[in-house]
Amino acid sequence: MKIVEVKNLTYRINDFEILKNVTFSVEEGEFVGIIGPNGAGKTTLVRILVGDIKNYEGKVEVRGKIGYLPQLHQVQREFPITVKEFAAMGMYGRYRKIDWEKVRSTLKDVGILHKENDPIKNLSGGEFQRLSLARALLSDPDILVLDEPEAGVDEMGKASFYELLNRLRKEKNITVIMVSHDIGMVFKECSTIMCLNRTLHCHGPTETINPEDLKKIFTDFDIWIRGTRHYEIYHGRERD
């Protein structure tokens, strides 16, 4: 079932086209990685999907509830609030009374229950991303939308976060749409890749994406995907 459907999406600021005639769909259960150079319209697309931007042209249908993880720098982390209180914000608007057992269970799922009473400002980048994931999960989403979740997180933290994300999306049957600058990680983790450069440059299952198409807009593409199975396939080591 198509859980997201976008047709002929165009978005302008004054006369400048940020997105032009973008058409795609997302099937339920997919893990979609959105890549593209700086200024390609990736974050704009995410903001349209989550409803932050309304004045676009075209058709956007989202058939399910979205849980959203914005970029790390967009979240004010100096508020005097604890980890469990921040996570519980994902339940606001759904319950008159916070289900603290559910909050604690979700914090346990993402591996930070031991931090539940700590101020959020004391968390590392990786820990805060896990907390943001917990908050999004507490809204009981059908779709998780993530905007550069690896930003500000070290390599070990990235690998751990993606392992967690993949496990939870399978357990909870959640569709994931993720913007990332870490192209190697996208090719390793995502089932589907969408490359934006204001228009839709290419889109399809990860194994069908041709590196030659991406090299037109990513000069260091081979470096970014080196070590992934995709790199081995397209450099002749698995073609037989």
From Swiss-Prot:
SMART domains: AAA (SM00382). Belongs to the ABC transporter superfamily. This is Probable metal transport system ATP-binding protein TM_0124. Keywords: ATP-binding, Nucleotide-binding, Transport. One of its GO terms (molecular function) is ATPase-coupled transmembrane transporter activity. Part of an ATP-driven transport system TM_0123/TM_0124/TM_0125 for a metal. Probably responsible for energy coupling to the transport system. Pfam families: ABC_tran. Residues 4-223 form the ABC transporter domain. The keyword ATP-binding applies. It comes from the Bacteria. ATP binds at G36, P37, N38, G39, A40, G41, K42, T43. One of its GO terms (cellular component) is ATP-binding cassette (ABC) transporter complex. InterPro entries: AAA+_ATPase, ABC_transporter-like_ATP-bd, ABC_transporter-like_CS, Metal_Ion_Import_ABC, P-loop_NTPase.
